[in-house]
Amino acid sequence: MSAGLNEREYNIILHKGVDYGEFFNSLVDITNKDGIPNRKVTIANPRNGSYRQTHFYLTEVEKKQLLQHPSVLDIEIPPSKRTDIIKSIDAIQNSNFTRDPQLNAQSNNWGLVRSSYKDNPYGGNNETGLKYNYTLDGTGVDIVITDSGIQSNHPEFQDKDGNSRVQDVNWASLSGLSFTQHINHNRDQHGHGTHVAGTAAGKNFGWARNAKIYSLKISGLEASSDTGTGIDDDYAFDAIKLWHRSKPIDPNTGYKRPTVVNMSWGYVREFEAGGNLHITHRGLAYPSASLSQAKSKGLNSFSTSQKWRIPYRVTSVDVDIQELIEEGVIVVAAAGNSNLKQTDISNIDYNNGVTVDGSSTYYYNRGSSPFHSTDITVGAIDEAQYNNDGTYIDQKASYSDNGPLVDIYAPGSGIISAVTDDLIYAKDDYQYDDNFMEAILSGTSMASPQVAGIAALYLQSSPGMTPAKLKSVILANSSTQVHNPSESPSGSFSFNVNTPKLVFNKYGNSNPLEYKGDFTTTSNISF
């Protein structure tokens, strides 16, 4: 069905715990209950994978009426139909690193060693001489990479028999939803998704070396040459929920195969760096603020000559994340690369915002979607180390978002992994087969799959863990302190340098677990 005169598609999102069926049935019936339009409203998308969301065709007046209903949390234009927000999968690439591999030099993901030791084994040095001796490989776990796609024939994703572990699936058929998946959905012409997958589950660069890998290309994350091959957020999230819900019990474990979803992307709003800035910071107004004054109040940008990017929260996306986790899905998400504090409504910085030339206010300390307090939000540590009176401490990467909403940190700078020929950054021949490519990238996009891969190892050991239990176990086992050089006496950043926050693989070198199974590569990878 299409929209009628003066109608457009809106997603009605309900509060948790209300009678969803009664509310939505009232909309499609000719009734007038508590401000619900007195006509039969047409469904635009039934959202069969969501209990709390349905898309309807409404007028602007009807939307405003429904927003007053006590059952309604929010009403939004679906993200795929908005032009004021975009998805970002920015990665950063530099030419020199201290604790990082070099292309074409038989190097590897240094995160494998760093996150397998509680204490920093590098001690201020670039090399350790240590090996990554792994005991678990993610067998029995499914990892979903929501990104730009995955190059499924890359050797990094082979199993011990040389077959690709990237599953060739049609998400519409897998979930039973009525949308059409593009014939070229299962490819990557950007390279970001392939790199992320290699870190989470590659056989040389990754953690979960025998996990099954699923690619779900998100609309808006495709390469410019690949536009239109992704799946819109609403169908993508519903597909994962319905697929996980319908999984059978694995006879080898007595549980469903665990599902880990990595999300190395986020929503942002852009605005020009010039113009008349009005800053609100901690309840104080700074009209006609300069760029330097804006930065001093915690608003960071890539460059004053470029558009500024502000993390943006989308209610429907965050509700989808909550519903995924309630289904039992593990969600791991990148914090973002804006060096911004992320905080909740209880914090003094929650309402920090900027207004440009009298436009609407952009709040910059609330983080970005996808997010929910029950997911695992990951910041990045740097290749450089902080010298604390002779003790070398891992430090937050200069670009990484931080603050109370960031749950844990992982190596994110100078991470080598598999990529496609199409990657826009510098790349070189894959060191194990020169018909393919590898590259070194930096970003919280690279840190998030480190945690997703380690999560798969925990789930291989204990496949019945709930998302809440897994998160608590990962945080309880977190490693040594992370120094945040962005922290200032004024409290612009609130990350406590004494809090253990670095992800730790307890099934690695420090605490080996007796495990017998098929491994996709040999152990003893040198660093």
PLM region spans:
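Short glycine-/aliphatic-rich beta-strand segments at the starts of folded cytosolic domains
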Residues: 3-15
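Structural recognition of the beta-strand scaffold that forms the well-ordered cores
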Residues: 11, 142-146, 198, 212-217, ...
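Acidic glycine-/aspartate-rich tracts in secreted/extracellular proteins
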Residues: 17-19, 80-81, 148-152, 157, ...
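Autoinhibitory propeptides
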Residues: 31-114, 337, 383-384, 395
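Active-site core segment of subtilase-fold serine proteases
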Residues: 94-199, 205-212, 220-224, 228-231, ...
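Hydrolase catalytic cores
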Residues: 197-200, 214-221, 259, 412-493
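C-terminal subdomain of the subtilisin-like protease fold in secreted/lumenal serine endopeptidases
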Residues: 211, 215, 237-241, 248-265, ...
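Substrate-binding/specificity loop regions of serine endopeptidase catalytic domains
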Residues: 267-407, 414-451
